[in-house]
Amino acid sequence: MALNVIATLTLISVCVHADRICVGYLSTNSSERVDTLLENGVPVTSSIDLIETNHTGTYCSLNGVSPVHLGDCSFEGWIVGNPACTSNFGIREWSYLIEDPAAPHGLCYPGELNNNGELRHLFSGIRSFSRTELIPPTSWGEVLDGTTSACRDNTGTNSFYRNLVWFIKKNNRYPVISKTYNNTTGRDVLVLWGIHHPVSVDETKTLYVNSDPYTLVSTKSWSEKYKLETGVRPGYNGQRSWMKIYWSLIHPGEMITFESNGGFLAPRYGYIIEEYGKGRIFQSRIRMSRCNTKCQTSVGGINTNRTFQNIDKNALGDCPKYIKSGQLKLATGLRNVPAISNRGLFGAIAGFIEGGWPGLINGWYGFQHQNEQGTGIAADKESTQKAIDQITTKINNIIDKMNGNYDSIRGEFNQVEKRINMLADRIDDAVTDIWSYNAKLLVLLENDKTLDMHDANVKNLHEQVRRELKDNAIDEGNGCFELLHKCNDSCMETIRNGTYDHTEYAEESKLKRQEIDGIKLKSEDNVYKALSIYSCIASSVVLVGLILSFIMWACSSGNCRFNVCI
């Protein structure tokens, strides 16, 4: 037994003093966790949240182009030229429009703007225009310009929509008037006109002389004849009659002709569309701020490089894709396995099987070594850089896969188009659900691939070292190699950088292996001898026990008798 103990201690002494090199990976005190398809809450050294949840809370310039806030005027009040909105008449360019939903100055005369939602949608795609006079009021003939107390200007004087002319009788006459606008601007032109529907026939005759006037509007492709629909309607601003305002986009080279003998709101100013683009009309009471953003929502600007956002589906600009999720983390580091505090005999270094290394700097994978000069640790920058490139490609691929052509139209329509709004809502919700599901599934798959990639990279590095060392080392099975020769720091560096020459140390390694194998054989021989002795003694004890048991049984049954003679 003494020989066995001595042999074992000798083997331990050889192992402890051997030079060693280990392959391992980084571990940190990170609390980051990600989900995969097969597992939730996997600890990782690092991750990024792909969903942006923060915004500026203000309206900002979009990519350097300022928005326009309509102030106290609604979109309709601005377009038709409410006299209280003259400060907005100089607007020419914007990145998007902001409308206060409670703006007091809309249509000052009771009525409506026909196809209001469609016009709003059109203006969502306009970046700049110029207001220009289409037909001078004096060119129509023997009619007068009408004004109303419902539409007062900033001085309190009766006025009317500045982009329209309300013609009434002159000298108790209202002849048939007619004019044509020919679009020679080379651009699309927005033309407005309207029809006044009086309370009664008497009011009709008072204003227009004719009891049943008409208005005819026609272009090359369509024609519309309007008749007055008299009747009392719910009103405001002291008026009970009604005005309906129409619009049309006249393309270059097209003409539009107007003919009327009463109830006609003639076009005066129109808008030359100078630039189309991608915009939006946000309805909010939030005012503008001096800031710049690349993505604007109804609640604030988003400045982020993240792939997704959960702030607003109606975002404008270079925006992350909207999904319904609070958090979506993509693994960018390794599976985080805490380091083992006390490794091996006398705190010896250990490889990746026994956990990560907290001291690894500037790399995800690397080497630890132990020799007569001490211990050292170094990152393998080449394999780390390859992994970083792979993850960068992953993130870019996710962005590319999630870039779709779908744009929400929600928010461009008013109360008149409730069915369109309902349909838009359903489409938005369905598409958002699909995007959200696809995004989550994609990230879960990529997290699985990332963690598998890191495991494979560590094993590849281990296999690379094993091929270099060949028979000059013993693979301990835990990510470490026990070198069978002396290996100083320079020697360790050749193993790390792939320039190690195993033939240089082959003879020394062969002798060391024979020495270790001899100690193992002698130890095993002593073990076998000890086992033989123990086996013999155990067998004898069992045999004696059996004989004594037989004798006691025989005596108790009367088959055995002792005679004592004196």
UniProtKB/Swiss-Prot annotation:
Disulfide bonds join C22-C480, C60-C291, C73-C85, C108-C151, C295-C319, C487-C491. Belongs to the influenza viruses hemagglutinin family. The chain crosses the membrane at residues 533-553. Its main location: virion. Coiled coil: none annotated. Palmitoylated. In natural infection, inactive HA is matured into HA1 and HA2 outside the cell by one or more trypsin-like, arginine-specific endoprotease secreted by the bronchial epithelial cells. One identified protease that may be involved in this process is secreted in lungs by club cells. The gene is HA. It is a single-pass type I membrane protein. Keywords: Clathrin- and caveolin-independent endocytosis of virus by host, Clathrin-mediated endocytosis of virus by host, Disulfide bond, Fusion of virus membrane with host endosomal membrane, Fusion of virus membrane with host membrane, Glycoprotein, Hemagglutinin, Host cell membrane, Host membrane, Host-virus interaction, Lipoprotein, Membrane, Palmitate, Signal, Transmembrane, Transmembrane helix, Viral attachment to host cell, Viral envelope protein, Viral penetration into host cytoplasm, Virion, Virus endocytosis by host, Virus entry into host cell. Pfam families: Hemagglutinin (PF00509). Residues 554-566 are cytoplasmic. GO terms for biological process: clathrin-dependent endocytosis of virus by host cell; fusion of virus membrane with host endosome membrane; fusion of virus membrane with host plasma membrane; viral budding from plasma membrane; virion attachment to host cell. It comes from Influenza A virus (strain A/Gull/Maryland/704/1977 H13N6). This is Hemagglutinin. The record marks R343, G344 as: Cleavage. Residues 1-18 form the signal peptide. Binds to sialic acid-containing receptors on the cell surface, bringing about the attachment of the virus particle to the cell. This attachment induces virion internalization of about two third of the virus particles through clathrin-dependent endocytosis and about one third through a clathrin- and caveolin-independent pathway. Plays a major role in the determination of host range restriction and virulence. Class I viral fusion protein. Binds to sialic acid-containing receptors on the cell surface, bringing about the attachment of the virus particle to the cell. This attachment induces virion internalization either through clathrin-dependent endocytosis or through clathrin- and caveolin-independent pathway. Plays a major role in the determination of host range restriction and virulence. Class I viral fusion protein. Responsible for penetration of the virus into the cell cytoplasm by mediating the fusion of the membrane of the endocytosed virus particle with the endosomal membrane. It is found in: Virion membrane; Host apical cell membrane. InterPro entries: Capsid_hemagglutn (IPR008980), Hemagglutn_HA1_a/b_dom_sf (IPR013828), Hemagglutn_influenz_A (IPR000149), Hemagglutn_influenz_A/B (IPR001364).
